[in-house]
Amino acid sequence: MHYSLFFGAALAASVSTVSAEAGCNNDGGNWYCSAVDLITYSGFSTSGTYDLVTSMSGGKCGSEKHEYSGAFGPLGEELSIHLRGPMQLFSMAVYNRGSGEKPKRELKPSIHERRHGHSHQRFHEKRAVGDKVVAIIDGQVVSWINEYAGGAPAAPTSAPGAPGINEPQVKSNGYKGGDKPKDPKPHGPVNVAPGDWRRVALVDTDKQEAEGVSFLNNNGGWDKGVDQAFGAALKRLGLDDDFFGMGDGPNFPKDPTIPDGKELIIMSDKSCEGGSCGFTRPGADAFHGFGGEDKIFLFRVAMPLTGTRGSSIYDPKDMPAIWLLNANIPRTSQYPMDPTCSCWKSGCGEFDVLEVLAPGDKRCKSTYHTKQELSGGSSYYFDRPEEPITIAVVFNGDDGTLYVKTLKEGFDKFPETLSPEDVKKLCASDGKTNNFALAS
C-alpha cells in the first residue's frame, strides 16, 4: 500500500487499452474488470539494483547501490507484513520450503551482505533460548524451540490463559514498550520431509497463540532517541496500545479487530542484532522480516464495512488492505518525508495482496510496485471479504510465479507443515483466474 494512493492510478492507466478492449471500467482512475478467485504474477525482473539506505543523520540520508537476484527480484528478500483496518485478523501463518539436504533458513547472502558482513547466518550461529533450531536427524529435517541456555534449567512458565478474544483484560507478563516478552511456550520437533513447507510463524487470535512473530506499528518516530525529521518509525506494540495487549509468552492480540484506518505490522521475532539486518534506523525497533525465495503467507481475515470517510487521502477510512514490503523499507522509514530515506522509490519492492482503493468499495486490487517500468497490477479484482475467508500468497520459485488466491472454504487451519499436494491446491485454478505477465 506504500504510496499506492499516489501511484495506483498511474499503474492502472498503463493497462487502459487492454482494459477497454476487455470491456472493463475506469472507476476513479483505476481499471476494474471482473471478480476472480486467483491472480498469478509472472515475468519478474530477476536481477537489478536499488538504493539501499546506509545512513540517517542530520536530517539527510545516504545510500548505496544494492544488487538483487532471484526468481522474484527484490521480493525474494526479507518481507514485512502490513495490515490496515477495518479488519478482523483471525489467524496468519508463514511457511518456507524444506530441503532434503539441509534446512533452507535463508537465501545465500546478498552482494551487499558479502561486502559488508551483514550475513543473517553469521549473527545467528549461536541459538538463544526460545530460538527455533533446525537440524537433520536420521535423514529428516526437524525443528524445535531451544530450551537450553548452557546453564541451569529455566524455570517452567505457565500456559497462556484462555479468556475470550473480545474480553478487555488480558494477563500481563510485564512487557511494555520495547521490553522483551517472555519466551514462547516450547513445542516438540517437527518433521519436514523433502519438498514440504515448514511453518516459521503463526498468529491465532482465537487460541491467543503466536510464534515467530513481532507486532509493531509505525508510530515510533516521536519516541526518545528517534530523529523526528525522518517521519514514521517502527515501534513494538505493548500494553499501552489501543488495540493490542499482552499474554503469557509472546505478545498476541487481545481482540482480532484492527480498527478503521489503523495499521499493524508483523515481522519475525528475530531482532536485528550485531548488524544482521544491515543499516536500521537509529533508536527505532528493528526486526528481521520473513526471508527465503520460496515462501507462503496465509491469512484468515474479514474486512467489514464501516461506512466512515476520512478527511483526506492521508486518512484512509473504510479502505482495508494487506500488503508486503521489502523489510528494508520499514526498518528505515515507511512514510518518509524525504524519499531518499527509503529504498521504495528506487524499486526495492512492495506487493499489495488485497487493497481497497476507495472508501466503502467492495473490490480489492493487487499490485506489484518496483521501478515504474517494471511495476504492474491486474485489472481483475477480488471481492472484499466481509465474512471470514482464507487468503493464500504463494511465492513458487520452481515456476517463478506468485499466486494470490481467496478461499471461501477450506484451509481455515494452518498446520505445522504443508505438503506439495497442499500447495498445489492453494495454487490451483477454480475457474475464475487471471494470469498477469509483468513487463520484465
UniProtKB/Swiss-Prot annotation:
Record field: catalytic activity: Hydrolysis of (1->3)-beta-D-glucosidic linkages in (1->3)-beta-D-glucans
GO MF terms, alphabetically ordered: hydrolase activity, acting on glycosyl bonds
Motif (ExDxxE motif): 350-355
EC number: 3.2.1.39
CC terms in the record's Gene Ontology section: extracellular region; fungal-type cell wall
Signal peptide interval: 1-20
Name of the protein: Probable circularly permuted 1,3-beta-glucanase
Originating organism: Arthroderma benhamiae (strain ATCC MYA-4681 / CBS 112371)
